[in-house]
């Protein structure tokens, strides 16, 4: 229990900022693991299809969005694994990816196969008659 508390203390302490702390923590961990290809926030915002200022406000919880796809795009840009994406969605107050939903299932398959290119994910969605994940979808 002590280990769990230490690892999750920031998310527990201030629930209004839990999403922010979680996203930054996961991105920082990935930057340590993949030091040869560092993730920059400006690139994550660009990949997600939003301006740097708007993306920063969403990530810092200064503005709220009801656009679940935007949060998923942030996670895909950050190369999050499925469990990390679902945690981020839950912390933001959105439903996690659900395998019985056809569109979510396509996204899950892409993530589980480590396809983090939005174009590839969009192609898979379109081939299945589903709405793109990209901002222009």
What are the functions of these language-model segments?
Residues 16-20, 52, 103:
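Short, leucine-enriched amphipathic alpha-helices that occur as contiguous helical runs
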């Amino acid at each position: 229990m002590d280990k769990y508390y230490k690892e999750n203390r920031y998310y527990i302490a201030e629930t209004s900022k839990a999403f922010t702390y979680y996203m930054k923590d996961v991105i920082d961990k990935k930057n340590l693991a993949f030091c040869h290809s560092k993730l920059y926030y400006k690139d994550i915002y660009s990949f997600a299809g939003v301006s740097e200022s708007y993306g920063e406000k969403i990530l810092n919880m200064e503005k709220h969005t009801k656009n679940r796809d935007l949060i998923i795009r942030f996670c895909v840009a950050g190369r999050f694994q499925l469990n990390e994406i679902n945690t981020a969605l839950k912390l933001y107050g959105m439903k996690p990816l659900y395998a019985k939903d056809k569109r979510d299932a396509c996204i899950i398959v892409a993530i589980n196969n480590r396809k983090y290119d939005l174009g590839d994910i969009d192609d898979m969605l379109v081939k299945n008659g589903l709405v793109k994940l990209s901002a222009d979808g």
